[in-house]
Every structure is written in C-alpha cells, then in structure tokens.
C-alpha cells in the first residue's frame, strides 16, 4: 500500500510490515512507535532514528510482540549479519566496523565544497539530483559514525568513550591497531 496518510497506512489491516524510509529521524521514531501500537512489524531504513533511539525502538517492538529490524542490504544491517554469523560460529566478537575512505581534510568539507572531493562539478551533481548534505555526511565521517552507532545498538557492542577515531589501517593492520582493538 502507498498513500499520503501515513497514519491510515499504519492502521490498515492488510499491512503487516511498515518500511520506514523517510530519512527524517524524528518522524521515523513517531512512525515506528505508531506501527508498533497497531501490531505492525517495522523495517527501519532511517538509520539516524536507530542511532539515536534504536534500543528504545527494539524494546517497544518487543513489548508490542512485533519485530523491529534494520534494512538488510544497507551497511549497518550487513555488519550486524556478520556479527551474528561470527557469534553463531562461536567466535567472540570484540569489535565491528566498516571501511571508510577518510582523509584529514575531509573534516573541513561542507555541502558547499563537497563536490570537489568527489571529482564532480556542482552542475553535474545538480543534474544527477545528488544531495550535497548527504554526500558530505559520507565524506566528513558523520554518516559512518551514525551507522556505527546503529551497529553498536543492534549488536550490544560498545563504542569508545573518546569517539570514533577512524585510524588508518588495512585489514591486516586491524588486530594491531590500538584504537580498534578492545582496551584492557
């Protein structure tokens, strides 16, 4: 079902699963809670809502007797799938993460300057319908940090108290990189 009245859709008896994909975190939390209240399962594509309210949403879904999930195919859900696989195989999981091409000067990028870093002109980006705020969030590290928070919420892994540091490391370097491996 598709429609302009989200509340009617959430209440519709033929709807079993709601896919929340507004990209608006505050609205997404409202949509999820309303869906749970009407006995609907939720697949949440709005990862920002999960990063900020994921444990609450999971708890509310469980209380309502429905399922709450991240969207499979998006990076956070794929990371969670790998964590689940490793734990099922009996491996102790001490860290999970994602690759991200990050260079120090990316932290100074803004939506007004982002296209130079992607090798695009503003005209090309506009023609392609590309959102400078979204593309900047991938570049400056804020989107990977939000996605990492969603992974921590879903897996029970913790995040460092001093934040995500994005240490430069190859796959072979990971076990010997102090900011990646657990502190003892």
List where the protein language model places each region.
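Conserved active-site and cofactor/substrate-binding residues in soluble primary-metabolism enzymes
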Residues: 4, 13, 52, 73, ...
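Glycine-rich, aromatic-lined ligand/substrate-binding cores of catalytic
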Residues: 144-184
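Conserved anion/nucleotide-ligand pocket segment
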Residues: 81-159
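A structured beta-alpha segment of the ubiquitous adenosine-cofactor-binding alpha/beta core
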Residues: 1-17, 22-26
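Short glycine/serine/threonine/alanine-rich loop segments
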Residues: 40, 65-67, 91, 157
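Rossmann-fold NAD(P)-binding glycine/threonine-rich loop
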Residues: 22-38, 45-85
